[in-house]
Amino acid sequence: MGNILNPGNDNSFINLVKARDTRVFVDKTDFLEKTNTLFNTDGKLLAVTRPRRFGKTVTAHMLSAYYSKGYAGQNIFDKLEIANRASFAEHLNKYDVIYIDMNTIDGLFDGYSNKKQKVEGVNDLVDYFEYSIIKELKSSDIFSKCLEKHQIENTGLLETLLAITQDLNTKFIFIMDEWDLVYREYCNDEALQKKFIKLLKNLFKADGGQDCFALAYLTGILPIKKYNSQSALNDFDEYNMLSPGDYAPYFGFTEDEIAKIVESPNCKVSHQDLKEWYEGYKIKGVDIYNPNSVCKAVSRSECISYWSGTSSNEEFVRLINTDFKGIKEDIINLIEGEQVTFSCANFQNDMVTIKDKNDVFSLLVCLGYLGCSDTKNKYRKVAYVPNAEIKAVLMDIVREQNWYERMETIKRSDNLLKAIMELDGTTVARVIQEIHNSSAVSLLDYNDEESLTYCVMTGLLWSTLDDYSYHREDQAGKGRVDLVYEPITGKMPLILIEFKYDGSAEEAIAQIKTQEYFKRYTGQYRNIIIVGINYSTKTKDHQCLIEKLD
């Protein structure tokens, strides 16, 4: 066993299985039943890409633990779902697996590059990639004599694998994690990228090295690079965030899986909170939750943003500061809850060839900053911010940009909060009416209280970020107040908001008083502002009355 050939070292899937009584564990081993059907078929080349922290590495480790001769998988899988499938024993630990983690290869190459003494023919990352695999194959008791006979050198991975396959009549399983590292970390090195993709094309083309593999599995963040609008590895069946296919349930947590997680006595967070914070990736009609964030929220009993994407955050900053007309406004609108239609038809699946806003949104979907839903045209997608976690990340990033305070939406939000503080009901009514009449509010939902609540929350979104938390339908006094803005620090007033339809703002204010919504907060806050907002379905006018309680 080595680090690449039949690795038996640290395996995140095995560690998770062993700790399943104390950690969140969702059995995704049904995925193995899917891959078992692909063996030695024209579907044996499979690429699945997803954003960071979507379980890609755990899944790759699961494949390795199941197929590799380097593991004793019976004890790992015997109580999991795959053990109930007819194909379970047929493939269990029967294959020589070549497992490549490109992050590890890149790190080792970095150390190699600093050495004075170099290996002949190993000059760049692609050479080192080949050399690392060949070195382990040469050190194997099974393959060493064959490779010695063929006088295999330090590079030439294709001829190495062909020699083994032809002489020993054996096939490998090839698993590559972070396949797209060359396109992300070396995004401006076009020569290295072309050398890398040429190597993979030769390995996996039908008249090349494809016969060396019973199954090949690539995973990463970016879809397979396109050249001249065609996939560079067109023999692969590819499934990504823009075209997820049938593998959506195996990456991320589904609604049913979340329901089981919250049933555990160890789970102290609610299904609704998990949904608000981490769901929203609708992949092929399946609601998907970010699995890494769910696990952290459950283990820490707190739903906050656990998004870890420092390098991709930098990429987001670069993308929203491009000169494409309207991109900043679109990002602000997305954060506020609107949707944007875009085309992914000409996206080249890299981080450099960004030609227009369509490519920006396509890349942001692949990175996980946006969700997308399908339309009748397979290339036309509808982008949206998927959940509170991503919304919080995007808001923090946007607020750091030098153009932030110049945006009309931000000015409007500041003016709305200022008007509430100054008890200026006329201005509040005007701003809410502007939002209500904007494209952000669906005509189908225009005349319901939900849309009015949305208008106020959207209007106050940016101006209340630092000083307020908000609650809807909060139990207070003798009933539930529609909307509460509770100050994080004591210097700001508490804001209670009640809505009416075809009534009056005076009625809304009277309800706050007669139902004594404020009593719950008496003693906590010295200043309480109450806001009554009415909308007339006949006149389409908004009315607002604001008072400060003594």
For each feature predicted by the language model, list its residue ranges.
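Active-site metal-binding core of divalent-cation-utilizing nuclease and nuclease-like domains
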Residues: 163-168, 465-491
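Mg2+/Mn2+-dependent nuclease catalytic core
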Residues: 193-198, 501-518
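Metal-dependent nuclease catalytic cores in nucleic-acid-processing enzymes
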Residues: 202-210, 362-370, 458-463, 511-531
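Conserved catalytic cores of phosphodiester-cleaving nucleases, focusing on short active-site segments
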Residues: 457, 481-485, 493-501, 515
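Phosphate-binding site recognition
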Residues: 1-447
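Acidic-basic catalytic patches of nuclease active cores, encompassing PD-(D/E)XK
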Residues: 437-471
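Structural motif
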Residues: 173, 493-497, 529
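Domain-level recognition of nuclease-like catalytic cores that cleave nucleotide substrates
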Residues: 520, 526-550
